[in-house]
Amino acid sequence: MKIAVANTLLLESDFDRVLKDLPNRSRLRYDRLQDIVNSAIEQKVDMLVLPECYLPFEWLPILARTCAKNQMAIVTGVEHLKVNRKKRAPLVSNLTAVILPFIEENYKFSYIHFHTKVHLAPHEKEKIESFRCVANNGNRYELYNWNDFWFSVYCCFELTSIYDRSMFQAYADAIIAVEWNKDTNYYSNIVESLSRDLHCFCIQVNTSEFGDSRITIPSKTETKDLLKVKGGKNATILLDTIDIVGLRNFQLKGHTLQEKISEGKKYKPTPPDFNYDVVSKKMHKSLWDVVE
């Protein structure tokens, strides 16, 4: 599967403007989004991942139509959504949109699902409350299946919970993390450990200001990053291919054989108590029978 990660800038001023009911909907901002999406389409990527808080909610229908037309999936952070309420403080949500295209009876469609951020970062919650708003917390995580690709989505600070980030071991072929985070060293350690502990691909996308956007595989230090990027003034994408079937085939082998075969030079062995039955069910397309 060909994955593209966006390398683009997030602005703190855009967050402030949302809270002031003066959102930035400039042509320049739209053109940057358009350039990224068009680049992904030209490169025929299967999935494009954008950072946390990136996409204005009002532009989602346009993006959904583009996904349907080109059969390209997109995972993107949605700019903070402020909902004004009568006689109550406005409610502010941090959403991640998962847009999955499909074809039904020769017609092209796309499905949008929203993940509500479960754990808001302390400074994020503080800023929301400083504008006399209330932060909305989610209460669940989702496991997605699209074209036999099983993945879950986490939004930045959620990854700091050991319990939350470990719940999809063996089930998820990949963990996708959308971020707006300057503590890249801390999150780098989390992602590298997560990739090995869950034995899956990790796709992390952060603002280009802080960087460390990457695709990481459960491998040794020298080869763990398929791509990694920071900085740059222009909005662009970087892409690489993840071998989902190859990783599953490796996971199904015993620990001793994993270390001996040639793929053992590419992947680290699976951790103790890894659920091989789940991988087998994915290979036989029967995992739907056991997930809730």
Residue spans of the language-model regions?
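Active-site-proximal beta-strand elements of phosphoester/diester hydrolases
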Residues: 1-22, 114-116, 149-158, 176-178
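Short catalytic-loop micro-motif centered on adjacent basic/acidic residues
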Residues: 48-52, 151-154, 175-177, 203
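Cys-nucleophile CN-hydrolase/nitrilase-fold catalytic domain and related Cys-dependent amidase chemistry
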Residues: 22-115, 181-183, 190-192, 196
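CN hydrolase (nitrilase-like) catalytic-core segments centered on the catalytic cysteine
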Residues: 62-75, 159-266
